[in-house]
Each structure stands twice: as C-alpha cells, then as structure tokens.
Amino acid sequence: MEMTPNERAEWTSHLHTPVIFNHHAPLQVESSTIQPVDLNPIKSTTKAADNKERVLILTPLKDASRYLSKYFELVSKLTYPHELIDLAFLISDTTDDTLAVLAAELDRIQKRTDGVAFRSVMIVEKDFGFVLSQDVEDRHGYAAQAPRRKAMARARNYLLATALKPEHSWVYWRDVDIVDSPERIIEDLTAHDKDIIVPSMDKQPAKHCDGARADPL
C-alpha cells in the first residue's frame, strides 16, 4: 500500500529518523565500494604504551638533508615501543638531496634487529612552488612569516591527511632540526591526558612593532 507524504510523516513522527534500524540483526552490505570504519575501539590514554596505542610521528622536510642524521639519532633513542610508532615525512620544494639522505637513513634504521626499527614509514612528495632564502635572517624576518607560515600549514595539512590512519591514537609533530629532546618525550606528553599540547615560550622576541617586543612567556 502506497502512503501519501502526509501519511508517511504522521507514521514516522515518533522517530528521530525515518529509517528504522534493528540493532540486533546485522545488516549485510554487499557493495565493495562501501567501507565501514569504527573508531570506537581507538583510545588515547595516559598509559599509552601499556595499552599498545599507536603513535604517528609527522615531520615536514624542505632542504633538510643536513639535519637528518641528528634527527634519526634522536628518534632512534625514543623509549616508546618502536613497534607502535609510524613515521611519515612530507618533502616539498626541495633543492638538495633530502630524499636520498632520508632514504639512506631509513634503510639503515629499518634494517636494525635490536628493536629500533619502526612499525612503518611513509614518504610523501608534494611541491607547493614556495621558494625561500636559506639565510637565517631572511627566513625569520617579519616579511617572510606570512607566506612561510602559509606554506608550512599546507604541507602539514597534506601530510596529516595522507598519513593519519584510523588505528592511530596519537599524533606527534616533530621538527627535523631539533638538536636535543628527552628520550621519554612521547610518554611525557601522553601522560598529561590532553588533546593538544604546545610549547608556551618564544625565544625570538619580535622587535618590528614600533619598539614593542614579545618577551618569553
């Protein structure tokens, strides 16, 4: 029997949705183009390592070959279980041998059998047509900050969107030029049980605003 639109509206008025689900009977979906993703089992807790929570370390790279040796020296010493860590890199607008050096360092790390090798590694290449002087003064000058930050944001968005998987509980953004960091930094960060943690300091006071300056917080 066909219902008029008014009759159907009255029939389903007690429902929040016009679709009736029987939660006790599984619905078999045959189409291979439909992929369900259940994020409910994925948790982020203060006992991340004990609960075997996966961590994704993301690092954008641009003309970074000279930093990679130190980068891997530090990340190889991380005490968080490496079998729970995935690495992902985005290489953009690079003019040096960053890709070759990265590949060599990863090959060396991933061949190790002493627990240093990571669960997986992804290398993403995406150019944005952004060119910036490698001179420190130019890179950190006020005029360069808006286009530089815009390019950095685009690179990070591409990297996150490409590398993040449903099984990841945590994302750790790590710059390539860090020269020192605690070996337990992942455990320290997850122990705070916060959605987002950022540093609250500025070691480069700005002097461009009519004599005003931003001091360290």
Across the structure, where does each feature detected by a protein language model lie?
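Short, acidic, metal-binding catalytic loop of nucleotide-sugar glycosyltransferases
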Residues: 50, 73-84, 94, 104-112
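N-proximal low-complexity "stem/linker" segments adjacent to membrane-targeting elements
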Residues: 1-77
